[in-house]
Amino acid sequence: MTGAGTPSQGKKNKTTHVKCRRCGEKSYHKQKKVCASCGFGKSAKRRDYAWQSKQGE
C-alpha cells in the first residue's frame, strides 16, 4: 500500500492549473477546463460569494 507521506510528494510534478484567460490567475484546471478563481468554463457570470468579503462592505 502506498502512503501519502513525504516520499509520495516527490511524484507531484505535473501541471494541474495554468493561467486563466479571463482573470489571469493560475487557477484554470487543465483537465476539468474550469477556473477555480473566476468560474470560467463553468459559468458566464464571475464566480463570487458573500463570504469572500466582510458583511456590509
Curated annotation (Swiss-Prot):
Binding-site list for Zn(2+): 20, 23, 35, 38
Signal peptide (from-to): none
An annotated Gene Ontology molecular function: structural constituent of ribosome
One GO CC term, this protein: cytosolic large ribosomal subunit
Cofactor(s) the record lists: Zn(2+)
Cofactor descriptive note: Binds 1 zinc ion per subunit.
Keywords: Metal-binding, Ribonucleoprotein, Ribosomal protein, RNA-binding, rRNA-binding, Zinc, Zinc-finger
Biological processes per GO annotation: translation
Zinc finger (C4-type): 20-38
Described purpose of this protein according to its UniProt entry: Binds to the 23S rRNA.
UniProt similarity note: Belongs to the eukaryotic ribosomal protein eL37 family.
Name of the protein in question: Large ribosomal subunit protein eL37
Organism in which the protein naturally occurs: Natronomonas pharaonis (strain ATCC 35678 / DSM 2160 / CIP 103997 / JCM 8858 / NBRC 14720 / NCIMB 2260 / Gabara)
